């Protein structure tokens, strides 16, 4: 069984792989960046799919819990990569999503 820290790191890595895999095509289509960026985007999305298989819970439960982490990582990306300041509403929404994720991910298994 993976430790809580390893599961959290796996969720974050999974989210980054998904965001990169979607952000690069966005750059190609919306910002006129070179089309070769689609190759690393495809690799990143393949990595994302593979990382999802490493999570210890049932697939649907993993996807549900992952959603909360994805929201927090996407907001961090918005701030760090896109340079957009976050609002208190962003922070509150991420906190609520992470709380919901925690309820799903940390439920007793039996």
Curated annotation (Swiss-Prot):
Q: Name one GO cellular component term.
A: plasma membrane
- Keyword terms of this UniProt record: Cell inner membrane, Cell membrane, Membrane, Transmembrane, Transmembrane helix
One Pfam family of this protein, by short name? UPF0060
Question: In terms of one coarse class, where is the protein primarily found?
Answer: membrane
Where is this gene product found? Answer: Cell inner membrane
Q: Which residues cross the membrane?
A: 9-29, 34-54, 64-84, 86-106
Topology in membrane: Multi-pass membrane protein
InterPro entries named in the record: UPF0060
Q: Which family does it belong to?
A: Belongs to the UPF0060 family.
Q: What is this protein called?
A: UPF0060 membrane protein BTH_I2792
């Amino acid at each position: 069984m993976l430790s809580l820290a390893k599961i959290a790191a796996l969720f974050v890595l999974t989210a980054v792989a998904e965001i990169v895999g979607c952000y690069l095509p966005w750059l190609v289509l919306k910002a006129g960046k070179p089309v070769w960026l689609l190759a690393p985007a495809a690799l990143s999305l393949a990595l994302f799919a593979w990382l999802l298989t490493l999570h210890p819970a049932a697939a649907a439960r993993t996807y549900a819990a992952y959603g909360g982490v994805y929201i927090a990582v996407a907001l961090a990306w918005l701030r760090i990569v896109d340079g957009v300041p976050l609002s208190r509403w962003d922070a509150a929404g991420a906190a609520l999503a992470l709380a919901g994720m925690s309820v799903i991910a940390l439920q007793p298994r039996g």
